[in-house]
Amino acid sequence: MSLNPPNNLEHIITSQTLKWVFVGGKGGVGKTTTSCSLGVLIADRNPQKKVLIISTDPAHNTSDAFDIKFGAEPKVVPGVPNLSVMEIDVKDAMKGVFDESEQGTNQNGGFGLLSELTGMMGMLKSVPGIDEAIAFSQIINQAQQMNYDLVLFDTAPTGHTLRFLSLPTLLRDMLEKVIKLQDSFGPMMSQFGGMMGMNINFNELKPKMEHMLKTSEQIVEDFTNPNLTTFIPVLIPEFLPLYETERLIQELMNLNMDANSIIVNQILPVNDCCDYCKNKRAIQAKYLGQIDVLYGDFHLIKINMQTNEVRGVAALRAFSKNFEAKH
């Protein structure tokens, strides 16, 4: 990244290559307002593009931000014909991932085969976060099939997004184990599985796992390509949000996921009218100074505390002006 890049998101708004934009942050920092207003702005500035906002945050504040009820299917935002929103509960998507059934085996890229792996070895289920990561991969697969030009995720800064990036490594290890088991014990395991009521077929299991691995590797390849994917952390100038943002940035760097822009929200004006305001602003000033030092090579967008609630398309559109170049 270059030193002192412009303090706006024009490089994201006008990008002709970006397909995935993640907006994440600690609760209460304005993450959903950011993702929704950015979605409106990109749709407005690029009428030829189909834009989709997906909320994977359990709170699902996107409905509140637009003042429109959204659900698990994409719904067009009135007044913004090329922008749709959907809210997906990752926990709901996780249901059945490890159930011993064939539900979804043919429709979700082969992820239903986990039931077979669970019955065979009982290993995957014990891996922390694996069900969440695989459920998120199903959501990504679903989004790909919808043929939107750009997808914005309103998501928590940690959890399924980052866990998913390590999924191919885990699946590759599991595939190697399956191949070894197949070579050594395939016929015996199939016979034993039949006796125990487990539907295990090594000849079907291996290609299904290979397909699942290939699918997850392709998605991770997209997510680690800065021309296709970027992550925008949102914070407020306080200790915990800054600490969590720095931890997130380091983790994204380790996973080779691009992050070149940061939104700093809810900045108080300089105000000497009361001790509380003065002290609060002094605390913010300290952390704003640290943010400038830490992220001087990022597109750093600083936004003042809003005097009115940002709710509805008109308010989101007005808020989105914070992301544009100042003329």
Curated annotation (Swiss-Prot):
Q: Spell out the family assignment given in the record's similarity comment.
A: Belongs to the arsA ATPase family.
Name the UniProt key words of this record, in alphabetical order: ATP-binding, Cytoplasm, Endoplasmic reticulum, Hydrolase, Metal-binding, Nucleotide-binding, Transport, Zinc
Q: Which residues form the active site?
A: 57
Q: Where does ATP bind?
A: 26-33, 238, 265
Question: Primary place of residence?
Answer: cytoplasm
Q: Which residues bind Zn(2+) per the record?
A: 274, 277
Matches recorded under CDD domains: ArsA
Q: Give the record's subunit note.
A: Homodimer.
InterPro entries, A to Z: Anion-transp_ATPase-like_dom, ATPase_ArsA/GET3, ATPase_ArsA/GET3_euk, P-loop_NTPase
Name the Enzyme Commission number(s) assigned to this protein: 3.6.-.-
Report what the protein is called.
ATPase ASNA1 homolog
**Keyword Nucleotide-binding attached:** yes
What does this chain do?
Answer: ATPase required for the post-translational delivery of tail-anchored (TA) proteins to the endoplasmic reticulum. Recognizes and selectively binds the transmembrane domain of TA proteins in the cytosol. This complex then targets to the endoplasmic reticulum by membrane-bound receptors, where the tail-anchored protein is released for insertion. This process is regulated by ATP binding and hydrolysis. ATP binding drives the homodimer towards the closed dimer state, facilitating recognition of newly synthesized TA membrane proteins. ATP hydrolysis is required for insertion.
- Molecular function in Gene Ontology: ATP binding; ATP hydrolysis activity; metal ion binding
GO biological processes: tail-anchored membrane protein insertion into ER membrane
For this protein, the record's Pfam families field holds: ArsA_ATPase
**Compartments, record wording:** Cytoplasm; Endoplasmic reticulum
